[in-house]
């Protein structure tokens, strides 16, 4: 049920060549499974079992980390989601020194094509893999395109029902690039995921030798390798020689709430409205007619919305449709409105518009 409360409270040849360094020990090769190991997971590739190593489920969704281009120097014009999970793992044999690996292909698309159904499926699979009475896995790693990575990572953080570790990882350069960052990112992600020191920290994002909590982490640059950051809160750690080094003991935000989606079959439609000078949001009624169940205002400053837009939003709120006031700046706090006459907007607190959308869908 959507409730009107403050969210502050509710709340590839080149690839193979680049990673073909000799492993530290003899590495078991991937083998194709003829029969799925579990009816809950569509496992298509699995490493041979090594006693004493933890077990990691890699859910691949596509993205730049699985992308390919005709040129090894081209890191902008490429096809995302060209390489499957088996090739990703096989390109980094060092992975099998730190964990036994099962891989499943949830999707193989650019992250702009990730749907609510895919995200809901990943959440349910992660909970099945880690949070049951007899979990099959010790950790989950999700490979993902970077454009919407923070949305999926935050959704998992808000819906994972145990303190096991999920790491979401991507790359800023395709697998075929001469300086592809995917192999090292994947190795660091799996190594971080299976580390006991990672437990109790929520879902983590690992890229570019940095470890970031999903609740705070956001993409800050369209092209640079060091794009995922948490400006206000900072990183929680970074891999040193692939092994995670954390700056602080495990902790969770004081306002964090986890939502159980196990009985949810679909997420409601919530639209994000981008504010600007003289914004009207005239299309909200059409959105409602087409099934929108809520709106996020990506406002100016600390959630500012123009008076013309407020008129349209006041009308949809009068129909019981929730509206969250957030900020397109992506940093800072949108506080609850203390003026009752101003309307009943929900405060996004410190969540940016896309994370506010995911939380509103989960309430």
Where do the PLM segments sit?
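Accessory alpha-helical/coil subdomains and C-terminal extensions
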Residues: 53, 59, 67-69, 84-95, ...
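Short Gly/Thr/Asp-enriched flexible loops that form oxyanion-binding sites at enzyme active sites
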Residues: 142-164, 305-314
């Amino acid at each position: 049920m959507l409730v009107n409360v403050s969210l502050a409270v509710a709340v590839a040849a080149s690839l193979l060549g680049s990673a073909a360094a000799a492993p530290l020990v003899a590495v078991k090769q991937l083998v194709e499974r003829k029969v799925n190991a579990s009816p809950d997971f569509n496992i298509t590739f699995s490493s041979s079992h090594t006693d004493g190593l933890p077990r990691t489920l890699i859910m691949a969704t596509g993205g730049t980390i699985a992308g390919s281009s005709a040129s090894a120097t081209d890191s902008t014009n490429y096809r995302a989601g060209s390489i499957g999970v088996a090739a990703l793992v096989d390109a980094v044999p060092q992975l099998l020194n730190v964990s036994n690996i099962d891989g499943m292909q949830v999707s193989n698309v650019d992250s702009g094509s990730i749907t609510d159904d895919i995200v809901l499926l990943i959440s349910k699979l992660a909970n099945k893999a880690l949070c049951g009475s007899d979990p099959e896995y010790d950790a989950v790693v999700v490979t993902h395109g970077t454009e919407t990575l923070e949305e999926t990572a935050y959704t998992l953080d808000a819906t994972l029902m145990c303190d096991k570790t999920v790491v979401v990882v991507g790359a800023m350069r395709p697998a075929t690039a001469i300086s592809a960052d995917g192999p090292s990112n994947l190795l660091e992600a799996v190594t971080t995921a299976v580390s006991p020191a990672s437990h109790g920290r929520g879902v983590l994002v690992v890229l570019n030798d940095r470890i970031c909590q999903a609740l705070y982490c956001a993409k800050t640059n369209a092209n640079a390798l060091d794009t995922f950051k948490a400006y206000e809160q900072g990183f929680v750690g970074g891999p040193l020689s692939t092994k995670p080094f954390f700056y602080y003991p495990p902790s969770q935000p004081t306002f964090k709430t986890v939502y159980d989606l196990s009985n949810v079959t679909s997420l409601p439609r919530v639209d994000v409205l981008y504010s600007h000078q003289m914004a009207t949001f005239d299309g909200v009624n059409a959105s409602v007619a087409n099934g929108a169940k809520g709106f996020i205002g990506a406002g100016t400053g600390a959630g500012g919305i123009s008076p013309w837009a407020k008129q349209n939003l006041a009308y949809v709120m009068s129909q019981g449709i929730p509206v969250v006031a957030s900020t397109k700046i992506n940093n800072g706090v949108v506080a609850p409105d203390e003026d009752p006459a101003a309307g009943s907007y929900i405060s996004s607190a410190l969540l940016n518009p896309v994370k506010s959308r995911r939380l509103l869908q989960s309430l």
